[in-house]
């Protein structure tokens, strides 16, 4: 029996349109998986929408002199336009600022309270005497206590640290610039700590990827109750308290349920537990697609809410997309170093973007968008390999037969080489299916490319243009037709528009069967991206940041992520660093440390003890045998009383990944 799948995408925040990073991490992957699951005959719905509440909306509205609703409606429409242009399809798409959602969120809150998970607590919060109101974190700005840069009450853009408003130096109210005062007030809290054992069991039995499980475990070990109310007017009102609204991270995920309810009673089949024994519905799979910056919210807080409510199915898996940089630099909307979806699709087919963003790197890893790399990958992979084969096969079949030839009994009529290639098609389907179910989208595309390469090699070897035997020619082009049909079928979830054009030329349906229908005259479906186009688009879309870079070209200093000036070094200084491939032999936790693991590593000629701040991202057990990159000539240092004889290289902020050699190099290999 086929499963029911409910796919959700993180609710886009209505303070701006979509950029390429949003498309890559969340929306395109979800649409690809939805199309794939439907191809396999599953019952699938895709639910999404926009997140409309919170302080950033009110701040923007106040600055522009409009109502919050005006900001919400403007960007809700722009975001939906962008998603439509990316061919991202939804079965239900809503807004959190709607009667349906507000009512549903309040009912959810009441159920949590009824079950004993909501309580009141007195806290201290900044209060502006001039504005006569308590200030939510975004209404307070000041200097960062760590880097002295300008910072908001929740975050420093300069050094990237998470902040509490009370940590700011010289804080001020962003509305009137007055100095706020700390004043006692009452907030509502969700008793998340009471659910730690339930959450631990949930994560253990879920199908989440290991890196997400590890992150969830690190939070569950030290769970605190959660402040879920804010003293502002814009949001979902707390029932029976007109002075406070729900914190957006309490009410926004409930939108997944609200927007499914918009489809009618069918929502119950996806969300509600079995009526007879109140157990999870095993035939329903809920998969969340999100950006990695909100992984903890979906892996810990949201399941905690569902557990506290008690009547809903829990998510089966979470797929978190990594960050996307632009031309090697972090995207920044404030610095205008960003490419908006709406601008991009004015110049390039959205299917090309879908292909590139998924082919560029595994979904959970950070990657870079470079216009030159975009052009190169499209031209050398999609055009030179995939399109080259399919176009040649269709042109030749059209000229010789007017259709894709059909052979009724391939196992009797084809030779061993032909049959081996048909077996290759079956093997490709098998590998592709596994990669798609695991959301390994890059690997799934590699499967397609390998099949197209096999087709090109076969076509060249058979040289059908030299074959006089019509029966043999029919056999050759039948094999080419089977491969072409497989490529179109497998590529469809990634490039729905282009593959539909291809199938239209073939006069075929979206499956793996060849019917021998009359071919339309082949035309070029996949067009090469020219150098002049890339040059023109880069000048238009990267202009503001390039101008800024030109002004700063002569500077020989940069800033690190803490905002501190960083002197550039020469190659001689860099050459002093000794980097080697090491292998982890033993790993254990450092007592009384929240972040440190003690490792024993082999660097070829000796074993070293190293301390690394990767606890919570890796368990000791999964590190054994892993090859890493080690700085070997660093002076020994003590961390939490444990000596470290080197430094393990890793990357990432919220989600940390160890650096390892791309190929399986021998232990002790020098990295240069």
Curated annotation (Swiss-Prot):
EC number: 6.1.1.10
Intervals of motif 'KMSKS' region: 330-334
Major place of residence: cytoplasm
Subcellular location: Cytoplasm
Gene Ontology MF terms: ATP binding; metal ion binding; methionine-tRNA ligase activity; tRNA binding
Record-listed Zn(2+) binding positions: 144, 147, 156, 159
Annotated Gene3D superfamilies: HUPs, Isoleucyl-tRNA Synthetase, Domain 1, Methionyl-tRNA synthetase, Zn-domain, Nucleic acid-binding proteins
Names of the cofactor(s): Zn(2+)
SUPFAM superfamilies membership: Anticodon-binding domain of a subclass of class I aminoacyl-tRNA synthetases, Methionyl-tRNA synthetase (MetRS), Zn-domain, Nucleic acid-binding proteins, Nucleotidylyl transferase
Catalytic activity: tRNA(Met) + L-methionine + ATP = L-methionyl-tRNA(Met) + AMP + diphosphate
Cofactor note: Binds 1 zinc ion per subunit.
Motif 'HIGH' region location, chain numbering: 12-22
Protein encoded by which gene: metG
Family note: Belongs to the class-I aminoacyl-tRNA synthetase family. MetG type 1 subfamily.
Purpose: Is required not only for elongation of protein synthesis but also for the initiation of all mRNA translation through initiator tRNA(fMet) aminoacylation.
Residues of the tRNA-binding domain: 573-672
Superkingdom to which the source organism belongs: Archaea
Gene Ontology biological process: methionyl-tRNA aminoacylation
Oligomer and partners: Homodimer.
InterPro entries reported for this sequence: Anticodon_Met, Met-tRNA-synth_bsu_C, Met-tRNA_ligase_1, Met-tRNA_synth, Methionyl/Leucyl_tRNA_Synth, MetRS_core, MetRS_Zn, NA-bd_OB-fold
Pfam families cross-referenced by the UniProt entry: Anticodon_3 (PF19303), tRNA-synt_1g (PF09334), tRNA_bind (PF01588)
Gene Ontology CC terms, in alphabetical order: aminoacyl-tRNA synthetase multienzyme complex; cytosol
Name the UniProt record assigns to this protein: Methionine--tRNA ligase
Keywords, ordered alphabetically: Aminoacyl-tRNA synthetase, ATP-binding, Cytoplasm, Ligase, Metal-binding, Nucleotide-binding, Protein biosynthesis, RNA-binding, tRNA-binding, Zinc
């Amino acid at each position: 029996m086929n499963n029911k799948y409910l796919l959700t995408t993180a609710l886009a925040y209505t303070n701006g349109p979509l950029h390429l990073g949003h498309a890559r991490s969340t929306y395109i992957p979800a649409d690809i998986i939805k199309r794939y699951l439907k191809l396999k005959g599953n019952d699938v719905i895709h639910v999404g929408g926009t997140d409309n509440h919170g302080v950033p909306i009110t701040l923007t509205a106040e600055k522009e002199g409009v109502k919050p609703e005006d900001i919400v409606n403007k960007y809700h429409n722009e975001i939906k336009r962008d998603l439509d242009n990316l061919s991202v399809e939804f079965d239900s798409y809503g807004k959190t600022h709607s009667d349906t959602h507000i009512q549903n969120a309040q009912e959810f809150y009441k159920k949590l309270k009824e079950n004993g998970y909501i309580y009141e607590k007195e806290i201290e919060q900044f209060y502006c005497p001039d504005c006569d109101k308590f200030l939510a974190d975004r209404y307070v700005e000041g200097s960062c206590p760590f880097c002295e840069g300008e910072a908001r009450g929740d975050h420093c853009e300069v050094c990237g640290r998470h902040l509490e408003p009370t940590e700011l130096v010289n804080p001020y109210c962003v509305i009137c610039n007055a100095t706020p005062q700390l004043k006692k007030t009452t907030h509502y809290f969700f008793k998340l700590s009471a659910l730690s054992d339930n959450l631990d069991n949930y994560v253990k039995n879920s199908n989440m990827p290991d890196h997400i499980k590890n992150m969830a475990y690190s939070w569950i070990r030290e769970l605190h109750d959660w402040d879920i109310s804010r003293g502002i007017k814009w949001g979902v009102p707390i029932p029976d308290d007109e002075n406070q609204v729900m914190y957006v991270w309490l009410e926004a995920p409930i939108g997944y349920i609200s927007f499914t309810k918009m489809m009618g009673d069918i929502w119950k089949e996806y969300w509600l537990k079995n009526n007879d024994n109140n157990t999870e519905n095993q035939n329903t799979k809920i998969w969340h697609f999100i950006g990695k910056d909100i992984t903890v919210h979906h892996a810990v807080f949201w399941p905690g809410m569902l557990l506290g409510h008690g009547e809903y199915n829990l998510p089966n898996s979470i797929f978190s997309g990594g960050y996307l940089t632009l031309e090697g630099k972090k995207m920044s909307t404030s610095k205008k170093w960003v490419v908006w979806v709406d601008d991009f699709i004015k110049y390039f087919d959205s299917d090309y973007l879908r292909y590139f963003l998924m082919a560029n790197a595994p979904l959970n890893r950070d990657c870079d968008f470079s216009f030159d790399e975009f052009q190169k990958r499209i031209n050398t992979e999609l055009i030179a390999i995939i399109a080259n084969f399919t176009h040649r096969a269709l042109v030749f079949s059209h000229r010789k037969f007017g259709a894709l030839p059909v052979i009724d009994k391939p196992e009797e009529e084809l030779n061993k080489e032909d049959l081996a290639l048909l077996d290759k098609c079956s093997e490709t389907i098998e590998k592709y299916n596994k990669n798609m179910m695991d959301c390994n989208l890059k690997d799934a595309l590699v499967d397609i490319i390998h099949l197209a390469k096999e087709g090109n090699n076969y076509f060249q070897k058979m040289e059908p243009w030299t074959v006089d035997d019509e029966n043999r020619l029919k056999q050759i082009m039948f094999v080419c037709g089977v491969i072409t049909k497989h490529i179109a079928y497998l590529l469809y979830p990634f490039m729905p528009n282009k593959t539909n054009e291809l199938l239209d030329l073939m006069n075929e349906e979206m499956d793996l069967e060849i019917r021998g229908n009359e071919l339309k005259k082949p035309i070029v479906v996949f067009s090469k991206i020219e150098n002049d186009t890339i040059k023109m688009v880069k000048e238009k879309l990267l202009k503001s940041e390039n101008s800024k870079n030109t002004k700063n070209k002569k500077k020989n200093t940069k800033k690190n992520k803490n905002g501190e000036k960083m002197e550039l070094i020469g190659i001689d200084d860099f050459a002093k660093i000794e980097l080697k491939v090491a292998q982890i032999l033993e790993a254990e936790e450092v007592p009384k440390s929240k972040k440190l693991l003690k490792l024993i590593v082999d660097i070829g000629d000796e074993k070293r003890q190293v301390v690394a701040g990767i606890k919570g991202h890796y368990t000791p057990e999964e590190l054994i045998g892993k090859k890493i990159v080690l700085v070997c000539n660093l002076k020994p240092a003590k961390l939490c009383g444990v000596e470290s004889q080197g430094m393990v290289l890793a990357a990432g902020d919220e989600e940390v990944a160890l650096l390892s050699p791309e190929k399986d190099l021998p232990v002790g290999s020098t990295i240069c």
